[in-house]
């Protein structure tokens, strides 16, 4: 769930907010510096179509964000659900390593909808997007995110990446459309600007386009409308890749195409249980055990898999490479934060993860031609965030403990 786009909220969600603006398929975890990702923002709605989320506690511009019932909010490893009270829609979500799934339960309505903000990005905006309607149930495309669109460090973090998607709906696309906002070239499109009233007004006035099957633009949105009966459910599955559209489609086919929401949720629970069972504890209260395993869960979110199911990944030279069986390319290494806490723990409970990350940093230094380890890596960016060279401590610790599945001489 996402509650905010601008400001300084790296995860895109804050418990203090009273409204939700959508559900994204990429997300950062527990960071500052204005955040990033939060791409492919999906929102189920009913009634009038709004093209912007609007602003919480600001009625000067209307949007599709919705209040939600805190009492219905459930969050577990691999599962989240909530009731959107403005639309009386229950939303449930789960995921596989490369894909996500949303399960919506609608009220009775002649104008139910799923809408997607393709430009959305935590801390800024995607600067260009592409979408194509593939068939009666499927869309695919990409979202290009550059420093000009803010994001990590409001652009100073130099995050430059493209998210590719392949999405299928359980209801046919019989009544769909796009919107495309004409953003002037001289407009700044960063953290504060993209949530300003002039910018939101510009997007809200974008015309609806219904006579096309594919579109490229600076600020695109997509929607599909359909009638629903009380309690009717609609599912949406999405494959994500940072390599190319073929990678997103292949990730989709390999991981989620043949599965329903219940299967994905069950497999996600089993996968997290397997990981969390790396450490077993005794004694303590139930609350203390919950705190322990919640903290442990957070240590396992990053560095995350950056390699497609076929082994391909975008390297430090921004070209496509293929990893061999010795490592899985990973991303999001917040060195300053983790070199003396998370990574010493991982050397004990998950040495393969440490090996993957060291190989990822080594290949990135080699492919980029920089020949040094980045201290805060995000999607191949040498962001320069924080101080020192914490990766050296991670490397030394791993080497001493016998984790040497990398080119030590290099």
What are these regions (language model features)?
Residues 1-410:
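Accessory carbohydrate-recognition regions in carbohydrate-active enzymes
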């Amino acid at each position: 769930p996402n509650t905010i786009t601008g400001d300084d909220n790296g995860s895109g969600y804050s418990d203090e907010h009273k409204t939700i603006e959508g559900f994204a398929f990429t997300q950062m975890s527990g960071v500052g510096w204005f955040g990033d990702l939060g791409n492919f923002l999906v929102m189920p709605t009913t009634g009038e179509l709004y093209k912007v989320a609007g602003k919480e506690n600001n009625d000067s511009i209307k949007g599709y964000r919705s209040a939600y019932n805190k009492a219905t909010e459930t969050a577990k490893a691999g599962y989240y659900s909530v009731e959107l009270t403005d639309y009386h829609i229950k939303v449930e979500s789960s995921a596989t390593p490369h894909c996500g799934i949303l399960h919506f339960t609608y009220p009775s309505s002649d104008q139910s909808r799923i809408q997607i903000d393709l430009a959305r990005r935590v801390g800024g905006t995607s600067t260009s997007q592409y979408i194509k309607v593939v068939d009666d149930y499927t869309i695919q495309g990409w979202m290009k995110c550059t420093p000009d669109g803010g994001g990590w460090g409001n652009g100073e973090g130099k995050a430059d990446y493209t998210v590719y998607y392949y999405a299928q709906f359980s209801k046919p696309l019989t009544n769909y459309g796009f919107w495309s906002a004409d953003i002037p070239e001289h407009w700044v499109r960063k953290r504060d600007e993209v949530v300003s009233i002039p910018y939101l007004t510009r997007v809200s006035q974008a015309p609806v386009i219904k006579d096309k099957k594919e579109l490229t633009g600076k600020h695109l949105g997509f929607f599909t409308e359909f009638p629903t009966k009380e309690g009717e459910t609609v599912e949406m599955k999405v494959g994500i890749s940072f390599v190319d559209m073929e990678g997103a489609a292949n990730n989709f086919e390999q991981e989620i195409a043949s599965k329903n929401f219940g299967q994905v949720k069950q497999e996600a629970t089993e996968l997290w249980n397997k990981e969390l069972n790396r450490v077993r504890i005794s004694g303590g209260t139930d609350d203390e055990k919950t705190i322990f395993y919640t903290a442990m869960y957070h240590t396992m979110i990053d560095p995350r898999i950056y390699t497609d199911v076929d082994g391909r990944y975008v390297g430090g030279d921004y070209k496509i490479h293929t990893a061999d069986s010795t490592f899985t390319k990973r991303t999001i290494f917040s060195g300053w934060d983790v070199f003396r806490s998370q990574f010493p723990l991982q050397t004990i409970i998950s040495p393969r993860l440490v090996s993957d990350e060291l190989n990822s940093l080594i290949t990135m230094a080699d492919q980029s031609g920089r020949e040094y380890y980045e201290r805060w890596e995000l999607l191949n960016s040498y962001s320069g965030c924080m101080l020192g060279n914490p990766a050296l401590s991670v490397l030394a610790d791993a080497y001493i403990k016998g984790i040497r599945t990398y080119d030590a001489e290099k």
